[in-house]
Amino acid sequence: MLSVVILFLLVAENSSQSYTGNPVICMGHHSVANGTMVKTLTDDQVEVVTARELVESQTLPELCPSPLRLVDGQTCDIINGALGSPGCDHLNGAEWDVFIERPNAVDTCYPFDVPDYQSLRSILANNGKFEFIAEEFQWNTVIQNGKSSACKRANVNDFFNRLNWLVKSTGNAYPLQNLTKVNNGDYARLYIWGVHHPSTDTEQTNLYKNNPGRVTVSTKTSQTSVVPNIGSRPLVRGQSGRISFYWTIVEPGDLIVFNTIGNLIAPRGHYKLNNQKKSTILNTPIPIGSCVSKCHTDKGSVSTTNPFQNISRIAIGECPKYVKQGSLKLATGMRNVPEKASRGLFGAIAGFIENGWQGLIDGWYGFRHQNAEGTGTAADLKSTQAAIDKINGKLNRLIEKTNEKYHQIEKEFNKIEGRVQDLEKYVEDTKIDLWSYNAELLVALENQHTIDVTDSEMNKLFERVRRQLRENAEDQGNGCFEIFHKCDNNCIESIRNGTYDHDIYRDEAINNRFQIQGVKLIQGYKDIILWISFSISCFLLVALLLAFILWACQNGNIRCQICI
Protein backbone atom coordinates (compact mmCIF):
# COMPACT_ATOMS: atom_id res chain seq x y z
CA MET A 1 0.00 0.00 0.00
CA LEU A 2 2.74 2.46 0.97
CA SER A 3 4.85 1.71 -2.10
CA VAL A 4 1.86 2.36 -4.37
CA VAL A 5 1.28 5.84 -2.93
CA ILE A 6 4.92 6.85 -3.39
CA LEU A 7 4.94 5.63 -6.97
CA PHE A 8 1.84 7.72 -7.73
CA LEU A 9 3.45 10.92 -6.39
CA LEU A 10 6.58 10.46 -8.47
CA VAL A 11 4.57 10.01 -11.62
CA ALA A 12 2.55 13.17 -10.88
CA GLU A 13 5.72 15.26 -10.52
CA ASN A 14 7.35 14.02 -13.67
CA SER A 15 4.26 14.38 -15.80
CA SER A 16 3.35 17.87 -14.65
CA GLN A 17 3.81 20.28 -17.55
CA SER A 18 1.88 23.32 -16.26
CA TYR A 19 1.50 25.17 -12.99
CA THR A 20 -1.52 23.90 -11.06
CA GLY A 21 -0.73 25.18 -7.58
CA ASN A 22 -1.98 28.29 -5.84
CA PRO A 23 -1.20 31.64 -7.49
CA VAL A 24 2.00 33.27 -6.29
CA ILE A 25 3.05 36.92 -6.53
CA CYS A 26 6.58 38.09 -5.73
CA MET A 27 8.19 41.48 -5.21
CA GLY A 28 11.66 41.98 -6.58
CA HIS A 29 14.25 44.43 -7.82
CA HIS A 30 16.41 44.78 -10.87
CA SER A 31 19.76 43.04 -11.03
CA VAL A 32 22.52 42.61 -13.57
CA ALA A 33 24.99 39.83 -14.23
CA ASN A 34 27.94 42.08 -13.38
CA GLY A 35 27.38 45.11 -11.18
CA THR A 36 29.67 47.98 -10.19
CA MET A 37 31.65 48.15 -6.99
CA VAL A 38 31.26 51.26 -4.84
CA LYS A 39 32.49 52.33 -1.44
CA THR A 40 30.20 52.96 1.52
CA LEU A 41 30.80 53.97 5.10
CA THR A 42 30.86 50.35 6.24
CA ASP A 43 32.29 48.51 3.25
CA ASP A 44 34.97 49.26 0.66
CA GLN A 45 33.39 46.96 -1.92
CA VAL A 46 29.61 46.90 -2.33
CA GLU A 47 28.17 45.73 -5.63
CA VAL A 48 25.35 47.87 -7.00
CA VAL A 49 23.32 47.63 -10.19
CA THR A 50 24.47 50.98 -11.58
CA ALA A 51 26.93 53.66 -10.53
CA ARG A 52 28.19 56.92 -11.94
CA GLU A 53 31.81 57.96 -12.15
CA LEU A 54 32.18 61.36 -10.47
CA VAL A 55 35.83 62.10 -11.29
CA GLU A 56 36.51 63.52 -14.75
CA SER A 57 39.89 62.59 -16.20
CA GLN A 58 39.46 63.55 -19.86
CA THR A 59 39.93 66.96 -21.49
CA LEU A 60 39.22 68.37 -24.90
CA PRO A 61 42.35 68.86 -27.03
CA GLU A 62 41.60 72.59 -27.27
CA LEU A 63 40.38 75.63 -25.38
CA CYS A 64 36.77 76.58 -26.02
CA PRO A 65 36.13 80.27 -26.87
CA SER A 66 32.49 80.03 -25.84
CA PRO A 67 30.76 80.96 -23.62
CA LEU A 68 33.83 82.49 -21.94
CA ARG A 69 35.72 85.02 -24.04
CA LEU A 70 39.32 84.01 -24.53
CA VAL A 71 42.10 86.36 -25.66
CA ASP A 72 45.25 84.73 -26.98
CA GLY A 73 48.35 86.66 -25.96
CA GLN A 74 50.36 84.70 -28.56
CA THR A 75 53.98 85.83 -28.10
CA CYS A 76 52.98 88.51 -25.54
CA ASP A 77 52.28 88.07 -21.86
CA ILE A 78 49.73 90.31 -20.21
CA ILE A 79 52.26 92.80 -18.82
CA ASN A 80 53.97 93.29 -22.18
CA GLY A 81 50.49 93.84 -23.59
CA ALA A 82 49.80 96.55 -21.02
CA LEU A 83 53.16 98.24 -21.65
CA GLY A 84 52.61 98.22 -25.40
CA SER A 85 55.61 96.14 -26.46
CA PRO A 86 56.21 95.60 -30.19
CA GLY A 87 54.29 92.55 -31.39
CA CYS A 88 51.52 93.14 -28.85
CA ASP A 89 49.50 95.64 -30.86
CA HIS A 90 46.77 93.01 -31.42
CA LEU A 91 45.95 93.32 -27.71
CA ASN A 92 45.00 97.01 -27.89
CA GLY A 93 41.43 97.29 -26.62
CA ALA A 94 41.20 93.53 -26.02
CA GLU A 95 38.48 92.28 -23.66
CA TRP A 96 38.40 88.83 -22.06
CA ASP A 97 37.05 86.48 -19.46
CA VAL A 98 40.27 84.47 -19.63
CA PHE A 99 43.56 85.87 -20.90
CA ILE A 100 45.64 83.06 -22.41
CA GLU A 101 49.35 83.46 -21.79
CA ARG A 102 51.67 81.20 -23.75
CA PRO A 103 54.78 79.56 -22.27
CA ASN A 104 56.75 80.77 -25.30
CA ALA A 105 55.85 84.44 -24.76
CA VAL A 106 58.94 86.66 -25.00
CA ASP A 107 59.93 90.23 -24.20
CA THR A 108 60.47 92.22 -27.39
CA CYS A 109 61.53 95.60 -26.08
CA TYR A 110 63.96 97.17 -23.64
CA PRO A 111 64.84 94.71 -20.84
CA PHE A 112 62.78 95.35 -17.72
CA ASP A 113 61.57 93.96 -14.42
CA VAL A 114 58.49 94.58 -12.30
CA PRO A 115 59.25 94.53 -8.55
CA ASP A 116 55.61 93.67 -7.76
CA TYR A 117 55.10 91.54 -10.86
CA GLN A 118 52.44 89.16 -9.55
CA SER A 119 50.22 91.92 -8.17
CA LEU A 120 50.29 93.92 -11.41
CA ARG A 121 49.63 90.75 -13.42
CA SER A 122 46.67 89.92 -11.20
CA ILE A 123 45.21 93.45 -11.45
CA LEU A 124 45.44 93.43 -15.24
CA ALA A 125 44.00 89.92 -15.53
CA ASN A 126 41.07 90.64 -13.21
CA ASN A 127 40.26 93.87 -15.04
CA GLY A 128 39.27 91.89 -18.11
CA LYS A 129 40.05 94.64 -20.63
CA PHE A 130 42.85 96.81 -21.99
CA GLU A 131 40.93 100.09 -21.91
CA PHE A 132 43.66 102.71 -22.21
CA ILE A 133 42.76 106.39 -21.82
CA ALA A 134 45.42 108.73 -23.29
CA GLU A 135 46.18 111.96 -21.41
CA GLU A 136 48.11 115.18 -22.02
CA PHE A 137 51.25 115.53 -19.89
CA GLN A 138 53.08 118.87 -19.95
CA TRP A 139 56.73 118.02 -19.34
CA ASN A 140 59.09 120.99 -18.95
CA THR A 141 62.17 121.44 -21.19
CA VAL A 142 62.91 117.76 -21.83
CA ILE A 143 62.96 115.62 -24.94
CA GLN A 144 60.14 113.10 -25.12
CA ASN A 145 59.54 109.88 -27.08
CA GLY A 146 62.90 108.27 -26.46
CA LYS A 147 63.60 105.13 -28.50
CA SER A 148 65.90 102.11 -28.28
CA SER A 149 67.52 99.69 -30.70
CA ALA A 150 66.35 96.91 -28.35
CA CYS A 151 62.76 97.76 -29.18
CA LYS A 152 62.14 97.33 -32.89
CA ARG A 153 58.78 97.98 -34.48
CA ALA A 154 58.73 97.33 -38.25
CA ASN A 155 62.55 97.20 -38.13
CA VAL A 156 62.67 100.76 -36.76
CA ASN A 157 63.88 101.78 -33.31
CA ASP A 158 60.89 102.31 -31.06
CA PHE A 159 59.68 101.97 -27.47
CA PHE A 160 56.73 100.81 -25.35
CA ASN A 161 53.83 102.66 -26.95
CA ARG A 162 52.02 103.22 -23.60
CA LEU A 163 55.08 104.93 -22.09
CA ASN A 164 57.14 108.04 -22.73
CA TRP A 165 60.94 108.00 -22.26
CA LEU A 166 62.05 111.48 -21.10
CA VAL A 167 65.68 112.57 -21.61
CA LYS A 168 67.55 115.85 -21.22
CA SER A 169 66.96 118.67 -23.67
CA THR A 170 69.26 119.65 -26.49
CA GLY A 171 70.45 122.43 -24.23
CA ASN A 172 71.76 119.84 -21.77
CA ALA A 173 69.01 120.55 -19.26
CA TYR A 174 66.78 118.27 -17.23
CA PRO A 175 65.01 120.61 -14.81
CA LEU A 176 62.83 119.40 -11.97
CA GLN A 177 59.60 117.96 -13.29
CA ASN A 178 56.58 118.26 -11.04
CA LEU A 179 53.28 117.27 -12.65
CA THR A 180 49.90 116.55 -11.08
CA LYS A 181 46.93 114.63 -12.46
CA VAL A 182 43.58 114.68 -10.67
CA ASN A 183 41.11 111.81 -11.01
CA ASN A 184 37.81 113.58 -11.56
CA GLY A 185 36.18 110.47 -12.99
CA ASP A 186 33.96 107.83 -11.40
CA TYR A 187 36.39 104.94 -11.79
CA ALA A 188 39.83 104.02 -10.47
CA ARG A 189 42.83 104.68 -12.69
CA LEU A 190 45.87 102.46 -13.11
CA TYR A 191 49.08 104.33 -13.96
CA ILE A 192 52.13 102.32 -15.04
CA TRP A 193 55.44 104.18 -14.91
CA GLY A 194 59.11 103.26 -14.78
CA VAL A 195 62.61 104.15 -13.68
CA HIS A 196 65.59 103.68 -15.99
CA HIS A 197 68.77 102.21 -14.52
CA PRO A 198 71.73 103.10 -16.77
CA SER A 199 74.76 100.83 -16.98
CA THR A 200 77.35 103.57 -16.36
CA ASP A 201 77.64 107.05 -14.90
CA THR A 202 78.48 108.32 -18.36
CA GLU A 203 75.22 106.97 -19.72
CA GLN A 204 73.41 108.58 -16.79
CA THR A 205 74.77 112.06 -17.50
CA ASN A 206 74.43 111.67 -21.27
CA LEU A 207 70.75 110.90 -20.92
CA TYR A 208 69.67 112.90 -17.90
CA LYS A 209 72.57 115.26 -16.97
CA ASN A 210 71.78 114.88 -13.27
CA ASN A 211 73.61 112.15 -11.37
CA PRO A 212 72.05 110.64 -9.45
CA GLY A 213 68.53 111.01 -10.75
CA ARG A 214 65.41 110.45 -8.70
CA VAL A 215 61.77 109.60 -9.32
CA THR A 216 59.01 110.11 -6.75
CA VAL A 217 55.36 109.30 -7.42
CA SER A 218 52.75 110.15 -4.78
CA THR A 219 49.02 110.05 -4.10
CA LYS A 220 47.13 111.15 -0.99
CA THR A 221 47.66 107.74 0.57
CA SER A 222 50.94 106.44 -0.88
CA GLN A 223 54.39 107.45 -2.06
CA THR A 224 57.08 105.61 -4.02
CA SER A 225 60.56 107.11 -4.36
CA VAL A 226 63.25 105.41 -6.46
CA VAL A 227 66.91 106.31 -6.99
CA PRO A 228 68.38 104.68 -10.12
CA ASN A 229 70.78 101.80 -9.57
CA ILE A 230 73.66 102.47 -11.94
CA GLY A 231 75.81 99.47 -12.83
CA SER A 232 76.85 97.04 -15.52
CA ARG A 233 74.60 94.05 -16.20
CA PRO A 234 74.54 91.18 -18.71
CA LEU A 235 73.56 92.28 -22.19
CA VAL A 236 69.95 91.60 -23.16
CA ARG A 237 69.04 92.53 -26.72
CA GLY A 238 72.22 94.61 -26.78
CA GLN A 239 71.42 96.54 -23.58
CA SER A 240 73.06 96.36 -20.15
CA GLY A 241 70.71 98.96 -18.70
CA ARG A 242 67.34 98.05 -17.17
CA ILE A 243 63.94 99.58 -16.54
CA SER A 244 61.94 98.89 -13.39
CA PHE A 245 58.20 99.32 -13.85
CA TYR A 246 55.92 100.35 -11.01
CA TRP A 247 52.20 100.94 -10.82
CA THR A 248 49.92 103.26 -8.89
CA ILE A 249 46.13 103.16 -8.52
CA VAL A 250 44.38 106.52 -8.21
CA GLU A 251 40.87 106.34 -6.79
CA PRO A 252 38.13 108.82 -7.80
CA GLY A 253 38.76 112.18 -6.12
CA ASP A 254 42.44 111.37 -5.51
CA LEU A 255 45.42 112.74 -7.46
CA ILE A 256 48.84 111.56 -8.57
CA VAL A 257 52.04 113.66 -8.51
CA PHE A 258 55.12 112.87 -10.61
CA ASN A 259 58.33 114.45 -9.30
CA THR A 260 61.67 113.74 -10.98
CA ILE A 261 65.10 115.11 -11.83
CA GLY A 262 65.84 112.29 -14.25
CA ASN A 263 65.33 108.63 -15.20
CA LEU A 264 61.50 108.75 -15.35
CA ILE A 265 59.70 106.54 -17.86
CA ALA A 266 56.46 108.50 -17.87
CA PRO A 267 52.96 107.20 -18.64
CA ARG A 268 51.04 108.41 -21.68
CA GLY A 269 47.74 107.85 -19.92
CA HIS A 270 46.02 105.35 -17.65
CA TYR A 271 44.02 102.13 -17.73
CA LYS A 272 40.41 102.23 -16.64
CA LEU A 273 39.80 99.72 -13.85
CA ASN A 274 36.54 97.81 -13.66
CA ASN A 275 35.94 96.56 -10.15
CA GLN A 276 32.83 94.65 -11.22
CA LYS A 277 34.71 92.46 -13.65
CA LYS A 278 35.84 89.00 -12.57
CA SER A 279 38.31 87.76 -15.15
CA THR A 280 41.51 85.78 -14.86
CA ILE A 281 44.59 84.47 -16.64
CA LEU A 282 45.70 81.02 -17.79
CA ASN A 283 49.17 79.96 -18.87
CA THR A 284 48.94 77.05 -21.31
CA PRO A 285 50.20 75.92 -24.74
CA ILE A 286 46.80 74.41 -25.67
CA PRO A 287 45.37 76.05 -28.84
CA ILE A 288 42.03 77.83 -28.96
CA GLY A 289 39.47 75.86 -30.96
CA SER A 290 35.77 76.20 -31.75
CA CYS A 291 34.18 74.10 -29.00
CA VAL A 292 31.87 75.13 -26.15
CA SER A 293 32.85 74.71 -22.50
CA LYS A 294 32.61 76.72 -19.29
CA CYS A 295 35.68 75.11 -17.74
CA HIS A 296 39.31 75.53 -18.74
CA THR A 297 42.49 73.99 -17.40
CA ASP A 298 46.09 74.31 -18.50
CA LYS A 299 45.67 70.88 -20.14
CA GLY A 300 42.58 71.81 -22.15
CA SER A 301 38.90 72.60 -21.71
CA VAL A 302 36.67 70.23 -19.77
CA SER A 303 33.16 69.33 -20.86
CA THR A 304 31.53 67.35 -18.08
CA THR A 305 28.80 67.36 -15.47
CA ASN A 306 30.95 65.47 -12.98
CA PRO A 307 31.56 67.30 -9.69
CA PHE A 308 35.22 66.28 -9.41
CA GLN A 309 38.27 66.19 -11.68
CA ASN A 310 41.85 65.03 -11.33
CA ILE A 311 43.10 66.66 -14.53
CA SER A 312 44.80 69.75 -13.12
CA ARG A 313 44.92 71.92 -10.04
CA ILE A 314 44.65 74.97 -12.29
CA ALA A 315 40.98 75.23 -13.19
CA ILE A 316 39.12 78.31 -14.41
CA GLY A 317 35.40 78.81 -14.91
CA GLU A 318 32.56 76.58 -13.74
CA CYS A 319 34.80 73.62 -13.07
CA PRO A 320 34.68 70.44 -11.01
CA LYS A 321 36.75 70.46 -7.87
CA TYR A 322 40.21 68.97 -8.12
CA VAL A 323 40.75 65.79 -6.09
CA LYS A 324 43.63 63.37 -5.88
CA GLN A 325 41.52 60.27 -6.43
CA GLY A 326 41.36 58.86 -9.93
CA SER A 327 37.88 57.46 -9.37
CA LEU A 328 34.91 58.09 -7.08
CA LYS A 329 31.76 56.17 -7.99
CA LEU A 330 28.34 57.29 -6.82
CA ALA A 331 25.74 54.53 -6.57
CA THR A 332 22.74 55.30 -8.78
CA GLY A 333 21.07 51.94 -8.31
CA MET A 334 20.32 49.46 -5.60
CA ARG A 335 22.47 46.73 -4.18
CA ASN A 336 23.04 44.08 -6.85
CA VAL A 337 22.09 40.48 -6.07
CA PRO A 338 22.55 38.51 -9.32
CA GLU A 339 19.67 36.27 -10.34
CA LYS A 340 20.08 32.54 -9.82
CA ALA A 341 20.65 30.54 -13.00
CA SER A 342 18.23 27.69 -12.18
CA ARG A 343 14.71 27.79 -10.78
CA GLY A 344 14.16 24.05 -10.19
CA LEU A 345 11.79 21.42 -11.64
CA PHE A 346 8.70 23.60 -11.41
CA GLY A 347 10.35 26.83 -12.58
CA ALA A 348 9.56 28.25 -9.14
CA ILE A 349 9.80 32.02 -8.71
CA ALA A 350 11.40 33.82 -5.80
CA GLY A 351 11.35 37.39 -4.51
CA PHE A 352 13.89 39.95 -3.37
CA ILE A 353 14.90 38.04 -0.23
CA GLU A 354 16.71 35.43 -2.34
CA ASN A 355 17.94 37.36 -5.37
CA GLY A 356 17.33 40.14 -7.90
CA TRP A 357 15.81 39.86 -11.35
CA GLN A 358 17.64 40.45 -14.59
CA GLY A 359 15.79 42.01 -17.49
CA LEU A 360 13.51 44.26 -15.45
CA ILE A 361 13.92 46.93 -18.13
CA ASP A 362 11.06 49.25 -17.23
CA GLY A 363 12.03 49.85 -13.65
CA TRP A 364 14.09 48.94 -10.63
CA TYR A 365 11.24 47.40 -8.64
CA GLY A 366 8.58 45.08 -9.90
CA PHE A 367 6.37 42.03 -9.60
CA ARG A 368 6.50 38.48 -10.84
CA HIS A 369 3.52 36.21 -10.67
CA GLN A 370 2.68 32.59 -11.34
CA ASN A 371 -0.90 31.44 -11.85
CA ALA A 372 -3.02 29.18 -14.04
CA GLU A 373 -2.52 31.54 -16.98
CA GLY A 374 1.27 31.37 -16.75
CA THR A 375 3.98 33.65 -15.41
CA GLY A 376 4.70 37.34 -15.95
CA THR A 377 6.88 40.26 -14.88
CA ALA A 378 5.94 43.94 -14.56
CA ALA A 379 7.72 46.99 -13.19
CA ASP A 380 6.41 49.12 -10.37
CA LEU A 381 7.06 52.61 -11.66
CA LYS A 382 5.87 54.46 -8.56
CA SER A 383 8.46 53.04 -6.18
CA THR A 384 11.10 53.14 -8.91
CA GLN A 385 10.47 56.84 -9.60
CA ALA A 386 10.56 57.66 -5.89
CA ALA A 387 14.02 56.16 -5.59
CA ILE A 388 15.24 57.77 -8.82
CA ASP A 389 14.06 61.22 -7.70
CA LYS A 390 15.96 60.92 -4.43
CA ILE A 391 19.15 59.77 -6.15
CA ASN A 392 18.97 62.40 -8.91
CA GLY A 393 18.30 65.09 -6.33
CA LYS A 394 21.42 64.27 -4.36
CA LEU A 395 23.51 64.05 -7.55
CA ASN A 396 22.35 67.51 -8.66
CA ARG A 397 23.05 68.98 -5.23
CA LEU A 398 26.50 67.40 -5.20
CA ILE A 399 27.33 68.91 -8.60
CA GLU A 400 25.92 72.31 -7.64
CA LYS A 401 27.93 72.51 -4.42
CA THR A 402 31.24 71.65 -6.02
CA ASN A 403 31.21 73.88 -9.12
CA GLU A 404 33.88 76.59 -9.02
CA LYS A 405 33.49 79.90 -10.84
CA TYR A 406 36.54 81.73 -12.12
CA HIS A 407 38.74 80.11 -9.55
CA GLN A 408 42.40 79.43 -10.11
CA ILE A 409 43.65 77.03 -7.49
CA GLU A 410 47.36 77.19 -8.17
CA LYS A 411 49.08 80.55 -8.57
CA GLU A 412 52.41 81.50 -10.08
CA PHE A 413 55.18 83.41 -8.33
CA ASN A 414 58.46 84.78 -9.53
CA LYS A 415 61.75 83.65 -8.07
CA ILE A 416 61.98 86.59 -5.68
CA GLU A 417 58.84 85.34 -3.95
CA GLY A 418 60.11 81.77 -3.52
CA ARG A 419 59.27 81.56 0.18
CA VAL A 420 55.75 82.82 -0.46
CA GLN A 421 55.45 80.28 -3.26
CA ASP A 422 56.47 77.44 -0.94
CA LEU A 423 53.95 78.57 1.67
CA GLU A 424 51.20 78.91 -0.92
CA LYS A 425 51.86 75.46 -2.34
CA TYR A 426 51.86 73.98 1.15
CA VAL A 427 48.50 75.61 1.89
CA GLU A 428 47.06 74.46 -1.45
CA ASP A 429 48.36 70.92 -0.96
CA THR A 430 46.75 70.83 2.47
CA LYS A 431 43.46 72.13 1.07
CA ILE A 432 43.51 69.52 -1.70
CA ASP A 433 44.29 66.74 0.78
CA LEU A 434 41.39 67.82 2.97
CA TRP A 435 38.97 68.21 0.09
CA SER A 436 39.98 64.86 -1.43
CA TYR A 437 39.30 63.19 1.91
CA ASN A 438 36.00 65.06 2.28
CA ALA A 439 34.97 64.10 -1.26
CA GLU A 440 35.64 60.42 -0.60
CA LEU A 441 33.74 60.60 2.67
CA LEU A 442 30.86 62.48 1.05
CA VAL A 443 30.52 59.92 -1.75
CA ALA A 444 30.71 57.01 0.70
CA LEU A 445 28.00 58.63 2.82
CA GLU A 446 25.77 59.19 -0.21
CA ASN A 447 26.32 55.61 -1.37
CA GLN A 448 25.33 54.30 2.04
CA HIS A 449 22.21 56.44 1.94
CA THR A 450 21.36 55.35 -1.61
CA ILE A 451 21.52 51.68 -0.70
CA ASP A 452 19.44 52.32 2.42
CA VAL A 453 16.88 54.29 0.38
CA THR A 454 16.54 51.62 -2.29
CA ASP A 455 16.20 48.89 0.32
CA SER A 456 13.57 51.01 2.04
CA GLU A 457 11.55 51.43 -1.16
CA MET A 458 11.65 47.67 -1.68
CA ASN A 459 10.32 47.11 1.83
CA LYS A 460 7.60 49.73 1.30
CA LEU A 461 6.43 47.91 -1.82
CA PHE A 462 6.36 44.59 0.03
CA GLU A 463 4.39 46.07 2.93
CA ARG A 464 1.92 47.67 0.53
CA VAL A 465 1.12 44.29 -1.02
CA ARG A 466 0.96 42.56 2.36
CA ARG A 467 -1.59 45.10 3.63
CA GLN A 468 -3.72 44.50 0.53
CA LEU A 469 -3.74 40.71 0.66
CA ARG A 470 -4.12 40.34 4.44
CA GLU A 471 -5.39 36.84 5.31
CA ASN A 472 -6.01 36.00 1.64
CA ALA A 473 -2.36 35.06 1.20
CA GLU A 474 0.59 33.75 3.14
CA ASP A 475 4.09 35.23 3.24
CA GLN A 476 6.50 32.57 1.99
CA GLY A 477 9.48 34.32 3.54
CA ASN A 478 11.35 34.96 0.30
CA GLY A 479 9.58 38.08 -0.92
CA CYS A 480 6.58 36.13 -2.28
CA PHE A 481 2.97 35.55 -1.26
CA GLU A 482 0.99 32.38 -1.88
CA ILE A 483 -2.58 33.41 -2.71
CA PHE A 484 -5.38 31.14 -1.41
CA HIS A 485 -7.93 31.94 -4.09
CA LYS A 486 -8.13 31.91 -7.84
CA CYS A 487 -6.28 34.95 -9.16
CA ASP A 488 -6.15 35.50 -12.90
CA ASN A 489 -4.07 38.17 -14.63
CA ASN A 490 -6.69 40.87 -13.92
CA CYS A 491 -6.56 39.97 -10.25
CA ILE A 492 -2.76 40.11 -10.31
CA GLU A 493 -2.90 43.52 -11.98
CA SER A 494 -5.20 44.85 -9.25
CA ILE A 495 -2.62 43.80 -6.65
CA ARG A 496 0.11 45.58 -8.58
CA ASN A 497 -1.79 48.84 -9.04
CA GLY A 498 -3.24 48.93 -5.52
CA THR A 499 -6.93 48.38 -6.40
CA TYR A 500 -7.16 44.83 -5.00
CA ASP A 501 -10.20 44.29 -2.73
CA HIS A 502 -9.46 41.47 -0.32
CA ASP A 503 -13.11 41.30 0.85
CA ILE A 504 -14.19 39.95 -2.55
CA TYR A 505 -11.94 36.90 -2.22
CA ARG A 506 -11.97 36.52 1.57
CA ASP A 507 -14.40 33.59 1.90
CA GLU A 508 -12.77 31.60 -0.90
CA ALA A 509 -9.34 32.23 0.53
CA ILE A 510 -10.35 31.11 4.04
CA ASN A 511 -11.92 27.87 2.75
CA ASN A 512 -8.92 27.07 0.59
CA ARG A 513 -6.53 27.87 3.44
CA PHE A 514 -8.27 25.32 5.74
CA GLN A 515 -8.32 22.66 3.03
CA ILE A 516 -4.68 23.15 2.22
CA GLN A 517 -3.70 23.06 5.87
CA GLY A 518 -5.73 19.84 6.30
CA VAL A 519 -3.97 18.20 3.39
CA LYS A 520 -0.65 19.24 4.79
CA LEU A 521 -1.66 17.73 8.13
CA ILE A 522 -2.68 14.38 6.52
CA GLN A 523 0.44 14.28 4.45
CA GLY A 524 2.39 14.74 7.64
CA TYR A 525 1.43 11.17 8.73
CA LYS A 526 3.50 9.78 5.85
CA ASP A 527 6.67 10.52 7.76
CA ILE A 528 5.32 8.76 10.87
CA ILE A 529 4.32 5.65 8.89
CA LEU A 530 7.72 5.53 7.23
CA TRP A 531 9.53 5.70 10.58
CA ILE A 532 7.27 3.00 12.11
CA SER A 533 7.79 0.74 9.09
CA PHE A 534 11.55 1.24 9.27
CA SER A 535 11.60 0.46 13.02
CA ILE A 536 9.53 -2.74 12.60
CA SER A 537 11.74 -3.89 9.75
CA CYS A 538 14.87 -3.40 11.85
CA PHE A 539 13.28 -5.27 14.80
CA LEU A 540 12.27 -8.21 12.61
CA LEU A 541 15.76 -8.36 11.08
CA VAL A 542 17.38 -8.50 14.54
CA ALA A 543 14.88 -11.17 15.73
CA LEU A 544 15.57 -13.36 12.71
CA LEU A 545 19.32 -13.03 13.28
CA LEU A 546 18.98 -14.08 16.96
CA ALA A 547 16.73 -17.03 16.05
CA PHE A 548 19.27 -18.24 13.51
CA ILE A 549 22.07 -18.07 16.10
CA LEU A 550 20.02 -20.06 18.67
CA TRP A 551 19.11 -22.72 16.09
CA ALA A 552 22.74 -23.07 15.02
CA CYS A 553 23.88 -23.46 18.63
CA GLN A 554 21.34 -26.23 19.30
CA ASN A 555 22.46 -28.21 16.23
CA GLY A 556 26.11 -27.77 17.11
CA ASN A 557 26.85 -25.64 14.08
CA ILE A 558 27.88 -22.76 16.30
CA ARG A 559 29.77 -23.14 19.51
CA CYS A 560 29.43 -20.47 22.13
CA GLN A 561 31.73 -20.18 25.13
CA ILE A 562 31.28 -17.69 27.91
CA CYS A 563 34.39 -17.02 29.99
CA ILE A 564 34.35 -15.26 33.32
UniProtKB/Swiss-Prot annotation:
A lipid is attached at C553, C560, C563 (S-palmitoyl cysteine). It comes from the Viruses. It is a single-pass type I membrane protein. One of its GO terms (biological process) is clathrin-dependent endocytosis of virus by host cell. Residues 17-527 are extracellular. Keywords: Clathrin- and caveolin-independent endocytosis of virus by host, Clathrin-mediated endocytosis of virus by host, Disulfide bond, Fusion of virus membrane with host endosomal membrane, Fusion of virus membrane with host membrane, Glycoprotein, Hemagglutinin, Host cell membrane, Host membrane, Host-virus interaction, Lipoprotein, Membrane, Palmitate, Signal, Transmembrane, Transmembrane helix, Viral attachment to host cell, Viral envelope protein, Viral penetration into host cytoplasm, Virion, Virus endocytosis by host, Virus entry into host cell. The keyword Glycoprotein applies. Its main location: virion. Residues 1-16 form the signal peptide. Glycans are attached at N14, N34, N178, N310, N497. One of its GO terms (molecular function) is host cell surface receptor binding. InterPro entries: Capsid_hemagglutn, Hemagglutn_HA1_a/b_dom_sf, Hemagglutn_influenz_A, Hemagglutn_influenz_A/B. Pfam families: Hemagglutinin. Disulfide bonds join C26-C480, C64-C291, C76-C88, C109-C151, C295-C319, C487-C491. The chain crosses the membrane at residues 528-548. One of its GO terms (cellular component) is membrane. Residues 549-564 are cytoplasmic. It is found in: Virion membrane; Host apical cell membrane. Belongs to the influenza viruses hemagglutinin family. Homotrimer of disulfide-linked HA1-HA2. Major glycoprotein, comprises over 80% of the envelope proteins present in virus particle. The extent of infection into host organism is determined by HA. Influenza viruses bud from the apical surface of polarized epithelial cells (e.g. bronchial epithelial cells) into lumen of lungs and are therefore usually pneumotropic. The reason is that HA is cleaved by tryptase clara which is restricted to lungs. However, HAs of H5 and H7 pantropic avian viruses subtypes can be cleaved by furin and subtilisin-type enzymes, allowing the virus to grow in other organs than lungs. Binds to sialic acid-containing receptors on the cell surface, bringing about the attachment of the virus particle to the cell. This attachment induces virion internalization of about two third of the virus particles through clathrin-dependent endocytosis and about one third through a clathrin- and caveolin-independent pathway. Plays a major role in the determination of host range restriction and virulence. Class I viral fusion protein. Binds to sialic acid-containing receptors on the cell surface, bringing about the attachment of the virus particle to the cell. This attachment induces virion internalization either through clathrin-dependent endocytosis or through clathrin- and caveolin-independent pathway. Plays a major role in the determination of host range restriction and virulence. Class I viral fusion protein. Responsible for penetration of the virus into the cell cytoplasm by mediating the fusion of the membrane of the endocytosed virus particle with the endosomal membrane. HAMAP family: INFV_HEMA. This is Hemagglutinin. It comes from Influenza A virus (strain A/Budgerigar/Hokkaido/1/1977 H4N6).
